[in-house]
Amino acid sequence: MEQQPEGLHHERRVLARTVDRVMRPAATTVDADESALVAWELFERSGSSHLPVVRPDGRCAGLLDRADVAVACAAPAVALSGLRVEDLLRGHGPVIVHVAQTVRHAADLMTCTGTDAVPVLGEDGRLVGVLTATDIVAAFAGHPAREEPADLRPPAPPTLLPPPPPRRGYRGTAVP
């Protein structure tokens, strides 16, 4: 099926937009020297899939993915006690975009690096937001950029199930 001309023009307009018109503001961040458990708690409270990581001087150290933290938190508690957020970041420098860059540039960068989200830096080099693949798709669909404050987001579903009831008669003993 051939694409209609107005659809093609819309796509070109979206790709030519600057990132700041499509991204969402960074409402929640995590310090690079925080523990992995603190990062997990922030993910749970915010309901986000990505957390920007900032260094003590305010520079962006990268973007933490919820799945990476979930894998790390599956480790024994002893191993978790010394695990820092910065340890969870991938070994290379952060993949970032700047507010004045185009959506096309960001989409190309995300495709080449295999990421589904990137931190967005302002003109001063400080973190101003996060751009996700969902944000780009929403822009193509004509939806406005999302600006959900953390307190208006639906609560994240609980990740821990209640413990199973005790077994009765296990190995010849009964639970009172």
Describe the predicted segments one by one.
Residues V38, C60-G62:
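Short active-site-adjacent helix-start/loop capping segments
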Residues H50, C60, A117:
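Short hydrophobic/aromatic beta-strand element in the GNAT-like acyltransferase core
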Residues V14, V22, V38-W40, E44, ...:
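Generic detector of bulky aromatic hydrophobic side chains
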Residues P52-V54, L63:
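Short, conserved beta-strand edge motifs with alternating hydrophobic and charged residues
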Residues E2-P25, D65-T115, L127, T132-P176:
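Tandem CBS (Bateman) regulatory domains
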Residues T29-G47, V54-R55, I96-G114, V120-G122, ...:
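The conserved cystathionine-beta-synthase
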